[in-house]
Amino acid sequence: MDYVPWIGNGYRYGKNHRGVDDITAPKTGAGSSSGTSTNTSGSRSFLPTFSNVGVGLKANVQATLGGSQTTTTGGSKWPTLDQANLLLWTGSGWRNDKNGQSDENHTTFKSATGSGQQGGSSGTSAGNPDSLKQDKISKSGDSLSVVDTGQGDDTHYANLPPSITPTSDWPNALSFTNKNNAQRVQLFLRGLLDSIPVLVNKSGQDDNSKFKAEHQKWKYSDFKSDQTKLNLPAYGEVNGLLNPALVETYFGTTRAGGSGNQNRTTVPGIGFKIPEQNNDSKAVLITPGLAWTPQDVGNLVVSGTTVSFQLGGWLVTFTDFVKPRSGYLGLQLTGLDVSEATQRELIWAPRPWAAFRGSWVNRLGRVESVWDFKGVWADQAHSAVSESQAATSGTTTATGAALPEHPNALAFQVSVVEASAYKPNTSSGQTQSTNSSPYLHLIQPKKVTQSDKLDDDLKNLLDPNEVRARMLQSFGTENSTQAQPQSLKTTTPVFGAMSGTSAVCLVVGVPRRAQAQVNLAWISPPLNGWVGH
């Protein structure tokens, strides 16, 4: 089952762990009591060794999915979780921040899954997250020893709000008998999350206050003084639980190493852009697209044409994903602690996703996106004064005529650019180095000087006739009087590999009234065959 979060393979997980050689692993499948993976090819698996999402299983894999807690109906070969015994819980645990070991989670597979506490599915404490404890850690120099413990800190989030608890949609989502089944939705999510920026939260302290507003923000002064003590989630953690697979994805710009404390970049992925001014501005997450897997996305809830899931400290909601409206895919991010108004403030901008209008594929097979930055910049228009202007004229208030680039409103889209387009420099003393990896490309919005020009540009860009022209031009058919080739009807609005990544192609759709003119079968619908009709 592609969706069910990976429970583990019996190995402790940490920042240096990159999986297990499956050819040497016990030959048992995911439905076995050990929960180990099976791969006879001998290739190295880069799957996380534990589910680092806000979803887990109360019972072991065999008890939950092997039959004792499932039912089959209508002769279907796919088991459906029995609602009366729905053994799913939110919050897989947090990492151990004690003794300076903030970059590893030392909870063993036995303790994290509760497999050592249960021989089957019977018993009230079988895999109960409230009974799962964090292991004790002893450190002597560089040597660490992990000791199983029966008592200790809980390894789950005790204060997750009800808004992300499993719902009645879970049985359908975890079966393959529903159009909006989990496997199809995961294909959608994996493609989509590879082409849009994503926010990840700070895990907080080792107590029952995980999602306070102050944990979502980082001060520039703290960045400048000590970039290592902010507990940034840029080291591969989701919900405070380290994911070794994500460590390889993240771009550790804040990690110092080598001689002279020279900052070094490791595996290119994502990182944080430190505010340029010495103020309390929020850090900006930069990403060329994340390759999230089903193991990294939690609390998937499918309801009608809406899909919601938890990613880090945010609940991401996509509306109209089954039948997206013309040129629009609704996106919404909500802080997990929805009871606190300040918690809903994103670390980017008040309404970052209001800028997203959709994506499509050009004739080169690259994803292009439409971003409306007026909503993101609107709150900054009245205070747009550069430092140079303030220094020369002493002006402290803006005229409102200019719309400078919002420091927290950078645009990122999956596309291929020259490596020279983004070359962040790192220096130490007289030493300078340039990282020119094409994975680090950063596409910034064009600087708009007049608000009316922004309005006109967006109107032109989103006008149905302009969209039609762009589509025809992209495929080199703007001057053709022939019917569109069949390939356009079947291969264009799909998810596929784009430049080495799995990108989503959300077509800026053509209204029905223009369908006959364009003769493209995109209305029925773009996601047909992936997440249902």
From Swiss-Prot:
Residues 15-45, 92-166 are annotated as: Disordered. Residues 28-45 have a biased composition (Low complexity). Residues 95-107 have a biased composition (Basic and acidic residues). It comes from the Bacteria. It holds the Pfam family Adhesin_P1_C. Belongs to the adhesin P1 family. This is Putative adhesin P1-like protein MPN_409. It comes from Mycoplasma pneumoniae (strain ATCC 29342 / M129 / Subtype 1) (Mycoplasmoides pneumoniae).
